[in-house]
C-alpha cells in the first residue's frame, strides 16, 4: 500500500519549527492525481536569459550527442530548476509514482516539467542521498523569472502498478543514490 511521508530533514524542529511540507492530496473525489506543493520558495530563471548565448553556441551544429548536450548545459547554464516537495512516497515493489505537471502550469505560468513526466521507483524511498525526496524539474518559458512560493501547487503524482516480462534475467543491482542515480555511467 502506498503512503506519503515528510522527508527527515523537515522533521528537524530546531531548523523548521513549523514543518513547511504539505502532504499530497487529491483535489476531488474522482481525481487520479495527488497535488504536490513546493516545500521551499524557489526562483525559476527564465529560459530566455541565455537564448542568445545558446544560439551562438549552436550556430554551426545540426545534431548533438548526449555528451555535447551536457556541454551546452555547462556553457550556457540552461538547465531545469529542481523544486523540492519535502515528500517521499513509500510504495510496494510493483508500484511506481508518475509525476506530471499540473494542466494549468504552462497556460497560466509558462512552466513546464523538463522531462514531461517523472518516474519514482519504489526503491527511491528513503535512499541515503536525499531520503527519497520528490522534486519537480521545472523550466520557465516566460520572458522573466518566476518565483514559486512555499506551498504553491507545482505538479501531481499518480500511483501506478507495473508488470515485468516473464523471461527477464533476475536483476540484483540495488539503488545507491537519489535523483538520477540509475543512469548508466560506464
Where are the model-predicted features located?
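DUTPase catalytic domain/fold
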Residues: 1-186
